[in-house]
Regions:
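Conserved pre-ATP/AMP-binding loop-to-beta segment of ANL
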Residues: 18, 151-171, 177-178, 183, ...
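Conserved AMP-binding/adenylate-forming core of the ANL superfamily
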Residues: 18-63, 70, 88-93, 147
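Conserved AMP-binding/adenylate-forming
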Residues: 245, 301-431, 437-440, 453-454
């Protein structure tokens, strides 16, 4: 065995083959059954000509097939590429081209989009359709059906030489431009994000066999709410499968908080992971009704959040109803994994400080002064620096040497990953996350880059200039607001802007509100004054 995702998963299968691995609606698979279907997928990929290091796109909402394809790809030492199902055609085309995707697995509902872009993607040779029960639109020429593809394949494991040096790539929406692929060594991603470091001792498991032995403990039941196209959900699946847990997948495409609480009660979920307030607030609002209906939620003891703001007021309310919970707020990014966590309990509530989460410094995180390349010490409570992770960190951004040199640096002989989050020390030695140094907007866990939205809005004939900012929002954490200078005084409506911009950007990037200004403030060089735009939008919308 190696510190490799496929090896660790197969080691768990061999130890607990009859244990339930995954639940999706009425479909339930044991570890043995999930392994068999993943083997069939791997054997099918091999027959398609997919080789070690080939890139395989997965373009789907959460489903069991997503996980089977991901695991099958790892078994072949190929690399799955996550594709955002919200993207419009131009965004899809960019990502698939940038990622050098050779084969794509897509749900039927996305057939029309695939059909419209495939001729512009010469490297993309194989199209495999996952039947999702929808009409699907246009049929992609020469497409293969997933179930038909694997039907007659062997359930036997491939004899492939795997290594901890095999690659894992996660595409992030990006905070500084177009999507970027974060390239990890497989061993590093398992240590950082897959549970390869003992949570009690803080030490790395000495062997892959010891890592897989974790599954011999009592089984935990985890519920996956975030989409697998996001790193947080993929890493939750890693932790679940490599620990022998049961992973329950929300089988609804939309988010229904009442239904989620029913799943928690039915499956006796113990570990629930969300993406900030966008999920936390509706779950909080639905909680009293769930308890009033008599749902037994006593199994739940860990409620964690990643990727977005998880407001203390929501945590406090949840704890009023479920006082035995551990609420965990994780700080991190695609380039680092977790750089810190804070734990919120009924008897030990944490207060806000400095505008962001406060957490105990882990031994793998530092705050760096990038001007001097010095490590800021905990007794320096004045200096603001960049939150950085050391040790098991990514190798690079895929095909972006310039950005890689800025993000993955060496200080005192040790490599650090610095995605751009600002932080400082508090008097008690804890760290406070102050936010991303860039102007990116985080809305419901989705990172949105203002320049991309501005360019799309300017396609409208009556938009002379504009700046896009994020303002506080109870549901989404931040919402997108456009400050617009019109070409003339004719009416300009939000729906008209959305229609014009829909050819260029996905719906979740669209402004939720617009405000007008006679002039857009910029520096003499033409650089935007986002501080002015933020203040102006807040004043117009009466946001303090």
């Amino acid at each position: 065995m190696e510190f490799n995702a496929a090896d660790i998963f197969e080691g768990v299968v061999d130890r607990v083959p009859e244990r339930e691995a995954v639940v999706y609606g009425s479909t339930r698979l044991t570890y043995k059954e999930l392994d068999a279907r993943s083997n069939k997928a791997a054997n099918a990929l091999k027959k398609l000509g997919i080789k070690k290091g080939s890139h395989i796109g997965i373009y789907a909402f959460n489903c069991i097939e997503w996980l089977e394809i991901m695991l099958g790809t790892y078994k072949l030492c190929a690399i799955p590429i996550n594709i955002n199902y919200r993207y419009v055609e131009e965004e899809l085309k960019y990502l698939i081209d940038n990622a050098d995707v050779e084969a794509i697995f897509y749900q039927k509902q996305f057939s029309t989009k695939i059909n419209n872009i495939k001729d512009d993607l010469p490297l993309l040779k194989d199209f495999v359709c996952i039947n999702d029960g929808t009409d699907g639109g246009d049929i992609v020429e020469n497409n293969l059906d997933f179930e038909g593809l694997i039907a007659n394949e062997s359930e036997s494991r491939l004899m492939v030489e795997r290594s901890g040096d095999d690659q894992y790539i996660l595409y992030t929406g990006g905070t500084t431009g177009m999507p970027k692929g974060v390239v990890w060594r497989m061993e590093d991603v398992l240590m950082t994000l897959g549970g390869g470091i003992d949570a009690v001792t803080g030490e790395k498991y000495p062997t892959p066999e010891a890592f897989a032995d974790k599954c011999l403990q009592d089984q935990t039941v985890a519920l996956a709410l975030a989409p697998f196209m996001h790193g947080g959900a993929q890493w939750q699946s890693f932790n679940s499968f490599f620990s022998g847990w049961k992973l329950v997948i929300n089988d609804q495409a939309s988010f229904d908080a009442d239904y989620i609480w029913e799943i928690v009660a039915k499956e006796k979920v113990m570990n629930l992971t969300i993406m900030g307030d966008a999920m936390g607030r509706p779950l909080c609002d639905a909680l009293p009704g769930a308890l009033k209906k008599g749902l037994d939620l006593s199994s739940l003891f860990v409620f964690s959040s990643t990727a977005s703001v998880f407001s203390p007021s929501i945590k406090d309310t949840i704890l009023e109803y479920l006082p035995n919970l551990f609420l965990i707020d994780a700080v991190g990014s695609s380039e680092t994994g977790a750089t810190g966590v804070n734990i919120h309990t009924k008897d030990g509530k944490l207060k806000d400080s400095g505008g962001g989460p406060k957490f105990t410094k882990p031994n793998f995180s530092e705050i760096l002064n990038l001007d001097t390349l010095e490590i800021i010490q905990p007794d320096d409570t004045e200096t603001i620096g960049y939150l950085a992770r050391k040790g098991h960190v990514p190798m690079a951004y895929y095909k972006d040497e310039e950005k890689s040199k800025k993000t993955f640096i060496e200080v005192n002989g040790e490599r650090y990953s610095i995605p751009g989050d600002m932080a400082k020390y508090e008097e008690d030695g804890q760290m406070t996350l102050l936010g991303r140094g860039s102007v990116s907007i985080n809305s419901g866990g989705e990172k949105i880059f203002p320049e991309e939205v501005e360019m799309a809005l300017k396609a409208h004939s009556n938009v002379f200039d504009c700046l896009v900012v994020g303002v506080k929002d109870e549901k989404w954490g931040q919402k997108v607001v456009a400050v617009i200078q019109r070409r003339d005084e004719q009416d300009l409506f939000l729906n008209d802007l959305k229609e014009s911009a829909s050819k260029y950007i996905a719906g979740y990037k669209m402004p939720k509100e617009i405000v007008f200004s006679e002039i857009i403030e910029r520096a003499p060089s033409g650089k935007p004054n986002y501080q002015w735009a933020q203040s102006y939008a807040n004043s117009k919308l009466n946001i303090k």
